[in-house]
């Protein structure tokens, strides 16, 4: 994997970052900010300017987002609300036989899911632990975005098949913070947008390491999804599907394709 050309290089820093939503502070000036996100299907420039940056140190992985938004909106405030039905910023981290999904909206509401590919969920294996008991109320089978219809109803269209989705998963030590340049849920003015900061302890990513060292070694590559979904109203009607802006285009409207995610290289 280390021979793959990266889509983004995440620089190592020595200091810790205080997660407060301020992505203009000096430490983020050290980071390489991504290009403007593109449409997930077409690869054309996204409708709003969205960019991200990643930094890391020996203890934490850090993300920052800048999201242009003329009408900053977020009504869902309960943790694990289905915030992708509104507007959100998203990070997915691939762990080979599993992956982690994090979504955050402009109200700093968090939505988390941990996915395990069914073919990797074996009796006595590393996922056969109480935390991932498939008999619990919040464990579901998942075939992928927009796959549950017709011949693909049960298994979806991904060659690997279905996943177990654990919607009660909480990543230990996760920190998120939002700052808004404008007014939330007030359409009487024009906003500039909103910013998001995320901090994740490396110690919480053990299940996603997939044989890699934590923290990473210089040159290691992890696959991650960095994206944004935008609820858009035109003529009083909601545009479906919601416009999706991502770092790396998928060519199809499906977030849950780890093979399409961006290759993030960790460098010293």
Regions found by a protein language model. Give the residues of each.
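Structural preference for beta-rich elements and adjacent junctions enriched in aromatics
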Residues: 1-268
